């Protein structure tokens, strides 16, 4: 697999969004509208298990599998929250943290692990990989720093959003509208880089 870093970008009309996470699908579909790309779901495609040790590896695994299975360009995201006091955990394991099944349970577990820590600095990281059926890859990364709250705030977003207060914001990511979130979020930054690279 190669990473496409420069030169003219390819013309894309249809792209597969390689995720089963409905929250991510909503964010990506709306953000890609300026490109005029027709976004398609996975259909019957089964994504491989995330076995990579980095966000880049996990996103590439999913994007490449979807591109090869469909014959279309595929866009995948891998993201996570890294908490300084926990040595960067849960990181790439954010979606599988504690082997529990729901966002609420993962949030409760993270808060429990933070109970004795006063340093609540954290950051969200997102890596988008756009894979083509011929194996070429494009990577885009975004990060946002902030603080882990002592309890959830807001019911918007998904994942760890209700626990995360971005630096300079009075709203948690769980209290923001989708538009507010995309303007500052890790995924919003990665998407902005993709849009710029493709001329939007």
From Swiss-Prot:
Keywords: Hydrolase, Magnesium, Metal-binding, Nucleotide metabolism, Nucleotide-binding. It comes from the Bacteria. It holds the Pfam family Ham1p_like. GO terms for biological process: nucleoside triphosphate catabolic process; nucleotide metabolic process; purine nucleoside triphosphate catabolic process. GO terms for cellular component: cytoplasm; cytosol. The keyword Hydrolase applies. Substrate binds at residues 19-24, 79, 158-161, 181, 186-187. CDD domains: HAM1 (cd00515). This is dITP/XTP pyrophosphatase. It comes from Deinococcus radiodurans (strain ATCC 13939 / DSM 20539 / JCM 16871 / CCUG 27074 / LMG 4051 / NBRC 15346 / NCIMB 9279 / VKM B-1422 / R1).
């Amino acid at each position: 697999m190669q990473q496409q870093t420069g030169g003219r970008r390819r013309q894309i009309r249809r792209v597969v969004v390689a995720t089963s996470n409905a929250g991510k699908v909503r964010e990506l579909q709306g953000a890609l509208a300026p490109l005029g790309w027709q976004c398609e779901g996975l259909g019957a495609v089964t994504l491989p298990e995330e076995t990579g040790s980095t966000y880049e590896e996990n996103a590439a695994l999913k994007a490449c599998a979807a591109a090869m299975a469909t014959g279309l360009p595929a866009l995948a995201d891998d993201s996570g929250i890294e908490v300084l006091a926990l040595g960067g955990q849960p990181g790439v394991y954010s979606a599988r943290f504690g082997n529990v099944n729901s966002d609420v349970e993962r949030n409760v577990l993270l808060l429990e692990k933070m109970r004795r820590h006063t340093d609540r600095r954290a950051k969200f990281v997102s890596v988008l990989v756009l894979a083509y059926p011929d194996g070429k890859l494009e990577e885009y990364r975004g990060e946002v720093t902030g603080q882990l709250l002592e309890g959830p705030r807001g019911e918007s977003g998904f994942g760890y959003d209700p626990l995360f207060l971005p630096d300079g914001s009075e709203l948690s990511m769980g209290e923001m509208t989708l538009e507010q979130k995309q303007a500052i979020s890790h995924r919003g930054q990665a998407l902005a880089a993709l849009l710029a690279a493709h001329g939007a």
